[in-house]
Amino acid sequence: YLDEVQAAHLLDLLDDEPIVYRTMITLLLHTGLRRGELCGLEWDDINFDLSLLDVQRTSLYLPEKGVFVDETKNSTSRRVLKLTPDAVQLLKRYRMWQNSERLRIGDQWAEEWEQHPRLFTTWDGKPLHPSTVTGWFHTFIERSDLPPISIHSLRHTNATLLIAAGTNVRTVSSHLGHAQTSTTMNIYSHSIKSAEAAAAEALQSVLTRKKKQA
């Protein structure tokens, strides 16, 4: 995963990339979504007034079925996330870009999009293959000066940064859609211990100062 400085650098590098991939990667970093959850998003899932994202489904691929939508990984994966102001603004710009693309492409735009208005599609409005974003991100990382991380590492980065910022484990677990809090604790035990150590040091610093003043 990336640390705070590397994550900020990633966002800076994305400024020069196509808006569709800039939006996808930024959203993954800001929300901790799974790849399939990202690809399954529809515009009705976003409440721009309240800055909320409703995670309702996941997009998958099987050779015998092609790209299809399924329920989320588990019942707790069905969740509502609060979007950051930066993510909301980027989504608004991306929606304007997609609307202009629909007008430009015209009749070639997939009819099915009207019933299921996906955020992220092929050039003609069809469901995006989940591996498309994986392949793009792999190439992007190779030509960057960032560590060799995978697309799933963005989910770990999101969780690690939340923990480092002092977010409690139960909230992080709910945010990630984990079935059990113990899953979060097992995966991020090192980050949790580091955050606890930092909290202990901060408390020690405060109490030591109070003691000296007394």
Task: State what each model feature region is.
Residues 45-52, 148, 167-187:
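Short, polar N-cap/turn motifs at the start of nucleic acid-interacting alpha helices
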Residues 26, 30-37, 131-132, 136-143, ...:
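C-terminal catalytic core of tyrosine-transesterase DNA break-rejoin enzymes
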